[in-house]
Amino acid sequence: MSHNLFASTQNREISASLVLSRCTPSNLKQKPASESHSIQLHQILFIDESIADYKTLAEGALPGIEVIILNPAQNAIEQITQLLAQRQRLNSLHLVTHGKPASLDFSTGSLNQTTIPHYAPQLKKWAASLAPQAEILLYGCNVAQGEIGETFVRHLSQLTGATIAAAKTPVGNSNLGGTWNLAYQTRNINTALPFNTCVLQTYPGILPTLDWSVLNLA
């Protein structure tokens, strides 16, 4: 993917602030991951902090969805597993991260065909926190592209016990070739997109492969 989401930081911040001012109510505040919740929410939106304008997506989440920004200093799969251990009967999980065919690329590393055997014991634990017929939606570019991508998604579905949807194309801004359509589904998905319409229409980026070389220089 030729688009570098780590370039022009100042322009991204200005763009994000404009989107937020248009798309979110003035009294909406994101809750930190450490804050306890007295009311059990049944959908969780996990966002990797490496995503360009991640705050735009976090603030644009629909009401009733718990938003968790993954800590870039801690393994992403371990974070998700630890948090899910504190939840029950979740209907939907949304994972927003970079992607490529058969790979979810977090700032701390990738979940792919090579690493999935290592993470399999943790992924199996997710099932205990999910409701029957729960769904997991993966927002990463091209994760389900090709046979290798579809096989990867089916493997995740088998490990977690959830129906999974993933993209076969870039995810995000249509002007950059993106879409919010998760075209590959292990079964029919009933969960709606977790973001308000304004954010879906104005989010300025896409979610391609994480540029490790740029990230390591930051």
Question: Model-predicted segments: where are they?
Answer:
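N-terminal acidic, proline/glycine-rich, low-complexity intrinsically disordered segments
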Residues: 1-13, 19
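Short, basic/hydrophobic alpha-helical segments
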Residues: 27-33, 77-91, 120-132
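Caspase-like cysteine protease fold
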Residues: 166-211
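A general structural motif
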Residues: 40-42, 64, 88-91, 131-135
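Short glycine-enriched loops at secondary-structure junctions
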Residues: 49-51, 96-99
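Catalytic cores of nucleophile-dependent amide-cleaving enzymes
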Residues: 92-96, 103-175
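Short, solvent-exposed loop/edge segments of extracellular or virion-exposed proteins
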Residues: 214-218
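A domain-level signal for caspase-like cysteine endopeptidase catalytic cores
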Residues: 2, 19, 24, 28-77, ...
